[in-house]
Curated annotation (Swiss-Prot):
Prevents the cell division inhibition by proteins MinC and MinD at internal division sites while permitting inhibition at polar sites. This ensures cell division at the proper site by restricting the formation of a division septum at the midpoint of the long axis of the cell. InterPro entries: MinE (IPR005527), MinE_sf (IPR036707). The gene is minE. This is Cell division topological specificity factor. The lineage of its organism: Bacteria, Pseudomonadati, Pseudomonadota, Gammaproteobacteria, Enterobacterales. GO terms for biological process: cell division; regulation of division septum assembly. It comes from the Bacteria.
């Protein structure tokens, strides 16, 4: 039966291929559009406050916003601090 299925199977039309690609693009954009407009400014403000106390590379701070359900958002902040320098006694 596999041989019969091979000859009778229809190839995907270009319309179906285009539809699948469009669905992938739309899904990727939706995932990226969930980020609020204030998040980059919030990251800059947090980095500015941290830099008042510790010399830090801006790449060592990550801010992510996760959507947990319809009405719950979780803001995750990860800061990699440099090694503490020993002070002479």
């Amino acid at each position: 039966m596999a041989l019969l299925d091979f000859f009778l199977s229809r190839k995907k039309t270009t319309a179906n291929i285009a539809k699948e690609r469009l669905q992938i693009i739309v899904a990727e954009r939706r995932r990226g559009d969930n980020e609020p407009h204030y998040l980059p400014q919030l990251k800059r403000d947090i980095l500015e406050v941290i830099c008042r106390y510790v010399q830090i590379d801006p790449e060592m701070v990550t801010v992510q916003l996760e959507q947990k359900g319809d009405d719950i958002s979780v803001l995750e902040l990860n800061v990699t601090l440099p090694e503490a320098e020993e002070t002479p006694k």
